[in-house]
Amino acid sequence: MFRLIKKIKDNGRWRIFKLKLIDARLYFVSIFVGLLTGLVAVPYHYLLQFFFNLRHDFFDSHPKWYWYIPLFLLMWGILVFVSWLVKKMPLITGGGIPQTRGVINGRVDYKHPFLELVAKFVGGILALSTGLSLGREGPSVQIGSYVGYLVSKWGRVLSGERKQLLYAGAGAGLAAAFAAPLASSLLVIESIERFDAPKTAITTLLAGVVAGGVASWIFPINPYFHIDAIVPGMTFWGQVKLFLLLAAVVSVFGKFFSVTTLQMKRIYPAIKHPEYVKMLYLLFIAFLISMAEFNLTGGGEQFLLSQAMHPDTHILWIVGMMLLHFVFSTFSFSSGLPGGSFIPTLVTGGLLGQIVGLIMVQQGVIAYENISYIMLICMSAFLVAVIRTPLTAIVLITEITGHLEVFYPSIVVGGLTYYFTEMLQIKPFNVILYDDMIHSPAFKEEPRYTLSVEVMSGSYLDGKIVDELRLPERCVIINVHRDRKNWPPKGQKLMPGDQVQIEMDSQDIEKLYEPLVSMANIY
């Protein structure tokens, strides 16, 4: 028996077996991260819905005018408090996807992860409870990344495993927000990791399925399932013309949406008023919209759902509501308060599709019952135009609605939209936010940065001698971590499971991160 074990150890099978055990442990911990993320992100969603209903009941009761004053003052105080939280903890600002990518890349670090998690949770709920047009998905992604980070700290895992748990938590956060585990895994790959590694796909899927299961248990009724998607009876060339039209309209408005929102986000800090005065302006707009069309507040998701189920509305009214929602979302997002842009983007795309559908009904091309079909395709395509994550956009709409009828049209329109947005030179929204974050005055950059990559079996680095590797200029391998020990790099032959630490200039992180990580991975 002992001779057999010694023989296994000598021919390397023992090491492979240990690596498989380490992977199994990582997958098990990913499931745990998904469960914890679901237990945090789902209550986040529940409380957002609770406060939305509370506000709805208040405004729907049409109280005497003097009852609005204490509510207005209370919400003003809430926004001032949340803006103070953001000032104290800058990483909780906005949606959270760029911040999550920054932590994974090593640009920033969660210095006080538990406090920041609580601040993001509380700040996001309070900001959206006032009616601002913000989304829940970005904060859910960052909440999940905080959970993954904390579990990695408590579990004392390696730096490579920590990144996988961050990926798992981020994916689980989106899965908890939409009950869409497959789309959540794709979002991590397309928007955060930005290339496909098998281990990342597995960890995010495992965590996403668990978190999505928790979300489905708490929210068993998915309102998107009630949207009908009736395919219009059109010829092949009629469908081609329709898809080209939708892609062109979505691409042009996507360009306008991205440019306007980002310009407003840069103009907002330059407004020479105290922060509490800016919050007063923002709340005043939210109050007016709450009294005029309540469902447009809180991101506008309820308004989108009502229009998708009953799309036969006057076209001029929908145009006005879409423009109002767009302006309100732009102001809300530019404030920097905790809240994402994912749902406002979906709503804008859906309403744009409704406008196109109503025009086509007037021209006798389609019937009213086909408008929801157009809306779902435009929701997917608008995500492609703004965020540039085609796989996520296509799968998400199919997954949350359950309509396979829109899957193939979304692929065609999404592909055309991607091509048109490249022609229009629209940079991905989250990439611009990430660049703004790392170049902001508040960002402190260390001169050198250490990247840790795990060597996968069959990758380019597998079997290579460290001294023979030709790395980019000013990149140097400083350490090889193997079997829980640190080994000097000189003369080391790299093996699967090795954690290779590469030091580089901080200014080169974005340029070299993906090439260096891809050298250690297989596809």
Give residue ranges: language-model regions:
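Cytosolic Rossmann-like ligand/nucleotide-binding regulatory domains
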Residues: 457, 462-508, 512
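Alpha-helical transmembrane segments and immediately membrane-proximal extracytoplasmic
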Residues: 1-441, 447-449, 456-457, 481-484, ...
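Short, solvent-exposed beta-strand edge segments and adjacent coil->beta transition regions
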Residues: 448-452, 497-499
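Short, compositionally biased
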Residues: 512-523
